[in-house]
C-alpha cells in the first residue's frame, strides 16, 4: 500500500486538439506504460495531480494509480509543465513490476552548508535531482549530500556520494561522474576590484 493515490480515467480522444480541450476542462492528459501491458492514455483532474505533487516525496515514491477503479502501482517518469505559469500540462507514468528495476529521478537534499560558508566559500548546486536505478522497494525519497567537510575549491561528484542499498546512480553506471555541487571563493564585483586599486 502506498501513501500516494491518484485517480484517472481511460482516454480515447487523442491528439493535440483533444489535449487542449482537456486542459480547458480542468483536466490533463497522461499516459501509463511499462510492465507487460500496453501503453494507456489517461485523463487526470488537474487539481488532483497538482495537489499530489505539492509533496516533493510524490516524485520519488510509488503511486497507486486508480484507472476507472483498476489499481496499479506506478512511478512518475516525466512531467511537462507550462513554461511560464508552472502548472502541470502532461504526465508520464511507468508501471512498477515486482523484482524489476526501474529508473526514476530523485530529489537532492543538501545539508551542512553552513560550514563551508563560514570558511568564506559560496556553494553552487549543480543538480537538483539524480537519476537512480533500483527496485521499487529500494526507491529513496531523496539523496543526501553532506557539505559539512567541503573546503573552498571542492567539487562534489556523484562518486563522492554513498548510494543507498540497492540503488545505483544511472550516470555513474555509464561512466559519467557528474558534478553535484561545488564550493568556490566569492566572486569579486568589478567595482570592488577598481576600488581596491
Swiss-Prot record:
Signal peptide as annotated in the record: none
BP GO terms, sorted: translation
Keyword set, alphabetical order: Ribonucleoprotein, Ribosomal protein, RNA-binding, rRNA-binding
Record keyword Cell cycle present: no
An example Gene Ontology CC term for this record: cytosolic large ribosomal subunit
Entries under Pfam families matching the protein: Ribosomal_L25p (PF01386), Ribosomal_TL5_C (PF14693)
Disulfide cysteine pairs (residue numbers): none
Domain of life, source organism: Bacteria
Protein family per UniProt: Belongs to the bacterial ribosomal protein bL25 family. CTC subfamily.
PANTHER family: RIBOSOMAL PROTEIN L25/GLN-TRNA SYNTHETASE, ANTI-CODON-BINDING DOMAIN-CONTAINING PROTEIN, RIBOSOMAL PROTEIN L25_GLN-TRNA SYNTHETASE, ANTI-CODON-BINDING DOMAIN-CONTAINING PROTEIN
Function, as annotated: This is one of the proteins that binds to the 5S RNA in the ribosome where it forms part of the central protuberance.
Protein name, as recorded: Large ribosomal subunit protein bL25
Organism name: Pseudomonas putida (strain GB-1)
Amino acid at each position: 500500500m502506498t501513501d500516494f493515490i491518484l485517480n484517472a480515467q481511460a482516454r480515447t480522444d487523442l491528439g493535440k486538439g483533444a489535449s487542449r480541450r482537456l486542459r480547458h476542462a480542468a483536466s490533463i492528459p497522461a499516459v501509463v506504460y511499462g510492465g507487460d501491458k500496453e501503453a494507456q492514455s489517461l485523463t487526470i483532474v488537474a487539481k488532483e495531480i497538482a495537489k499530489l505533487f505539492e509533496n516533493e516525496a510524490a516524485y520519488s515514491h510509488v503511486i497507486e494509480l486508480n484507472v476507472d477503479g483498476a489499481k496499479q502501482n506506478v512511478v512518475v517518469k516525466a512531467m511537462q509543465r507550462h513554461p511560464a505559469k508552472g502548472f502541470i500540462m502532461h504526465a508520464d507514468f511507468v508501471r512498477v513490476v515486482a523484482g524489476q528495476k526501474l529508473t526514476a529521478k530523485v530529489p537532492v537534499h543538501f545539508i551542512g552548508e553552513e560550514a563551508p560558508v563560514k570558511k568564506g566559500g559560496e556553494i553552487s548546486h549543480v543538480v537538483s535531482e539524480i537519476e537512480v536505478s533500483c527496485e521499487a522497494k529500494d526507491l529513496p525519497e531523496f539523496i543526501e549530500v553532506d557539505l559539512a567537510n567541503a573546503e573552498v575549491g571542492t567539487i562534489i561528484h556523484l562518486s563522492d556520494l554513498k548510494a543507498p542499498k540497492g540503488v545505483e546512480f544511472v550516470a555513474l553506471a555509464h561512466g559519467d561522474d557528474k558534478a553535484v555541487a561545488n564550493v568556490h571563493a566569492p566572486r569579486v564585483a568589478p567595482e570592488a576590484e577598481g576600488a581596491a586599486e
